[in-house]
């Protein structure tokens, strides 16, 4: 099985160390462009662009990277409860058309009540997943060119439709990650690829089996991916030294503040990440070559594969043997580490190198009539 390898655009900051200004660098458009172009040339399938108040807007960043890349895909967040499904469907179709079919979408429900309240969302955990399920139903139907009437608990639309279709049919692929039962049920019923954070293989296997069984109950098969950091060097000793350097400027106060912030979220996945290290620096190798140091201060993906090329490749193949075909990777700083992974790791793996997509011809069309329909040629009698 060929593996799809993704990289990450650090729109929330980048540098040599975690939790400090020491060794940080400006993250401007030029720097993000360097990372995107490096990923494009090295053969990564795409890049994940993060979302939330700590990041630059993912959609604008993705759009700005389209003309400076050739084959790289952009995994961009859909935000149920923050954006209406009708607007999100139009945005998705536009991004897919502008990129010639290089758009992918990541369903993000949110987990921090404080941040969600700032965005005007006052739903609890279960309600957010209800809203996300309704959002996804409407979004998918619109991209399949249906005119949609929907009267749900959270989403209400009447006569919703999409005039300009996406390139990818029936709709651009939909990614999603969540560890709770309700999240897994949503994934099983509606998404194309289920993402998990980098837990030890035995825990990942358990998740995959649960989601696969739930999907089968809906008569569906879905793909699987994993989100991990990578610290790969020419030797194992060098890799572990780099891991220790990454957190060498962290103090206990910063760790405690970060863990307190994570504790207020209602994300089951974040709780599982925190439980891997319990906010402590000791015993951070939680599984062979799987290191939890990143999660001391970083929300979301908090583990890294650490080692030389053959060692990290072997660990990746262990996850692949569980059924994972997509690996969303990152490393600090992201420009240099994109090259290290591409040069030290890719030659040891069966990496699916994407081709440059051929331009997709679009049907000629006149201006929309009354903002309601696209004019068609009238048959001559």
Swiss-Prot record:
Full protein name: Alkanesulfonate monooxygenase
Reported pH dependence: Optimum pH is 9.1.
GO molecular function: alkanesulfonate monooxygenase activity; identical protein binding
Assembly and oligomerization: Homotetramer.
Xref: InterPro entries: Alkanesulphonate_mOase_FMN-dep, Luciferase-like_dom, Luciferase-like_sf, SsuD_RutA_monooxygenase
Gene: ssuD
Function: Involved in desulfonation of aliphatic sulfonates.
NCBIfam families: alk_sulf_monoox, PRK00719.1
Organism: Escherichia coli (strain K12)
Family stated for the protein in its record: Belongs to the SsuD family.
